[in-house]
A protein has these predicted regions:
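Conserved catalytic-core motifs of GNAT/GCN5-like acyltransferases
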Residues: 76, 135-136, 148-159
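A short beta-loop-alpha structural element at the N-terminal edge
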Residues: 6-20
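Conserved acyl-donor/pantetheine-binding loop and adjacent beta-alpha core of acyl/acetyltransferases
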Residues: 72-100, 108
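Conserved acetyl-CoA-binding loop-helix of GNAT-fold acetyltransferases
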Residues: 103, 109-122, 145-149
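Conserved GNAT acetyl-CoA-binding A-motif
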Residues: 117, 124-135
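Conserved beta-strand-loop-alpha-helix junction that forms the acyl-donor binding cleft
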Residues: 108, 134-144
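Conserved GNAT-fold acetyl-CoA-binding loop/helix
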Residues: 26-48
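Conserved beta-hairpin
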Residues: 55-71
């Protein structure tokens, strides 16, 4: 990817493009191998983006021409996180969770996920977060591999 990318908080003007990206990646996963178990129109879907947008948690990665990827950043930890032996001494308020990291199929293997995760690290530092937790399904082999390659520590069955 030779073009400069920008990551920013999404606006209402981005909503349709985010939903199109969700639909495109779900179609791609259905045609290949659906590691994350996403279903078009169910998750991720318009409601996912609308809720995150309303909460100021939806972020987009764009290159000036196209929406390349998106993610949701917040402190909401899924139910299963309670059973994982996380690093001691970190309160829930000091945790940032990356949810619904999605890259448009036309831009896979261009480093978009890496850009989004580096942005999440900067965001966490700027907002007093001491830990980043990556919400990824344990059988999502490419997702887990990505996080390991980017030197994220995996605890238990989630990263």
């Amino acid at each position: 990817m030779g073009t400069e990318v920008q990551i920013r908080e999404a606006t209402h003007g981005d909503l349709d493009r985010v939903v199109e990206l969700y639909d495109a990646i779900c179609d791609y996963l259905d045609a290949t191998f659906n590691y994350p178990g996403w279903t078009r129109g169910e998750y991720p879907a318009r409601w996912t983006a609308e809720q995150a947008l309303a909460n100021g948690e939806l972020y987009v990665c764009a290159d000036g021409k196209a929406l390349l990827g998106t993610c949701i950043l917040n402190g909401v930890q899924p139910e299963g996180y309670r059973d994982i032996p996380w690093q001691e001494g970190i309160s829930p308020a000091e945790v940032l969770v990356v949810h619904t990291l999605a890259v448009h199929p036309s831009h896979l293997r261009e480093g978009v996920s890496g850009h989004l995760l580096r942005f999440a690290e900067q965001y966490a530092q700027g907002h007093g977060k001491r830990s980043i937790r990556l919400d990824v399904y344990e059988r999502n082999v490419p997702g887990v591999r990505l996080y390991v390659c980017l030197q994220q520590k995996c605890d238990g069955k989630t990263c």
